[in-house]
Amino acid sequence: MKKKWMAAGLMILSVYVLTACMAGQQSTDSPDNKNISAELVWDSSMELRYATEFQVDRYEGGYELLTIVQDGRYLVVPEGKEAPSDLSEDIVVLQQPIEHIYLVASAVMDMFVSLDALDRVGFSGLRADSWYIEEARAAMERGEILHAGSYSAPDYEQIVSKGCGLAVENTMIYHTPEVKEQLEKLKVPVLVDYSSYESNPLGRTEWVRLYGVLVGKEEEAKKAFEEEVRAFEAVDQEEKTGSTVAFFYISTNGEVNVRRSSDYLPKMITMAGGSYVFEHLGEEEDTASSNVTMQMEEFYAAAKDADYIIYNSTTTEELSSIEELLEKSSLLEKFRAV
């Protein structure tokens, strides 16, 4: 058995799985989404290149309306100004500056780092030792970001006492709707991140522009996104290796969890010049979930000859050696990559 990680083709990635039930959908092109108040004059819409799950409409005076297709609408009100008096009840008002954010959608933290906006985050859904983003871990160790409980069990008292201006959740919050309701009762606005529902990897990346609006750093967000686009384009110009890749994790009951071929991760593998071993997996099923569960024997039959196997260690626990991987299943030792 090869001992070197590169020779083994085993990479430990820090990728968070975001899945949940679909919420009600509303059209972002409806005139009602732009004409939201007699006191506001619509100016323009943000031009998005890849993202389809959100929209930003700008109004005179610096007001901006964020529409998350499967979640709701949020009016960002400039500092020193007031929200219109005739807004629809479904529009959540976010008064700038938005501070002491309770960030539960862990995958969003990297966007705040790229915007140099960690100072806007006051609370984390993860503990310091669970963070794979060094800047977040360090901020928590310094006491600048506090742990305020998970999505299903937040520390309401701490969140409210520190003046939390916004809770950014992932779609797991819909498994515990009572938590969302309680936060809203306590006057903490809740925004649900749907970036994981973008079919294009660059669509997920473009959500940095939504967070740029929230923290008042739109130009920085646009620049950060364009840098990611250039990086993707550079990779796309590289020679395609055709190397086969499997991405998976093993649950506590021994079942193997892999991504549907329509998920963004298989698409990223293809964009990087590789080939996902489960080329058409789950395409015939109409479901919002990006995951498919199978028995180890089925996984072995499909992936045993893969050039690379990528273990998603953040879903269970972090692995640091091939030996720890083999403890998950002795059958893995028979894989060519191992």
Language model region names:
Residues W5-G24:
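Sec-dependent N-terminal signal peptides of Gram-positive bacterial secreted proteins and lipoproteins
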Residues E64-V160, L166-M172:
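A short, structured surface patch at a secondary-structure boundary
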Residues S88, Q95-I98, A105-F112, Y156, ...:
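Extracytoplasmic/secreted envelope proteins and their assembly/folding machinery
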